């Protein structure tokens, strides 16, 4: 048996560190397929639901090679041969199938075949909308994996919907925090806060000993972000209508700046984005002490590098994936 946790492709090493810290010495490893980390576990408690870099958690119980002659029958027999203690006395369940690759059957066919077999065996009613137990059958190429999904919804949905409307997930915001080495007590700025995801993730991770500032020019978005912060019990975040091109006018010195700047679609030509980067980075340089860091996302890495002022050193870069888009993460340090 093993626990599989999913994340954004490109963040597997960070999730591996988090899992290894939660379950030290148990052999966590990155899966060959992108966006997955696994660790041998026979049982998982509530502690796993506090993972900040994971979307979903699945406790897998079996792995098998599919028979070419009767693959659906093989899945049914494998499911019936396994113990399913979660189904004993459960109010409802459903089977969720995920397929990768070409197969002579569909995901609904897998769900129906395995679901009917488990229903006959345990007498538990099927509920496709809000099941008490989610049985997972993942078919990846010629292999199949059977287990139980531990998460009803993604762990990344930890804030009100208003804070999740932007392009950045809390998992990516958490990655920026870790790559910037943000620690409790540090002062943090989110200068393009939008719906507030970065600010909320920073405040909920670092706690009230860390002042968190959040700025944006859009009053409506700032209002939604404030509401989300209050609903999340993060009342110490300081929201301010501010122009990220002139940071020193609005904010005091900070230790870390975490940013998801506009990608240029609303700024017109590349020159508009270049000047935004130019002004923002010089303002960031003015706010940071030596050793202070900026962690940001960009879809225009060459443009950002061209706008980089003297006084910053590039400490880290990586590509991540979110929803079919591949932004670059940069970590800059003031010299």
Swiss-Prot record:
Localisation per UniProt entry: Cytoplasm
Database matches in SMART domains: THUMP
Pfam families to which the protein is assigned, alphabetical: NFLD, THUMP, UPF0020
Residues that hold S-adenosyl-L-methionine according to the record: 195-197, 243-244, 260
Domain notes: Consists of an N-terminal THUMP domain fused to a catalytic Rossmann-fold MTase (RFM) domain.
Function, as annotated: S-adenosyl-L-methionine-dependent methyltransferase that catalyzes the methylation of the guanosine nucleotide at position 6 (m2G6) in tRNA(Phe).
Family to which this protein belongs: Belongs to the methyltransferase superfamily.
Protein name, per record: tRNA (guanine(6)-N2)-methyltransferase
Organism encoding this protein: Thermus thermophilus (strain ATCC BAA-163 / DSM 7039 / HB27)
Gene: trmN
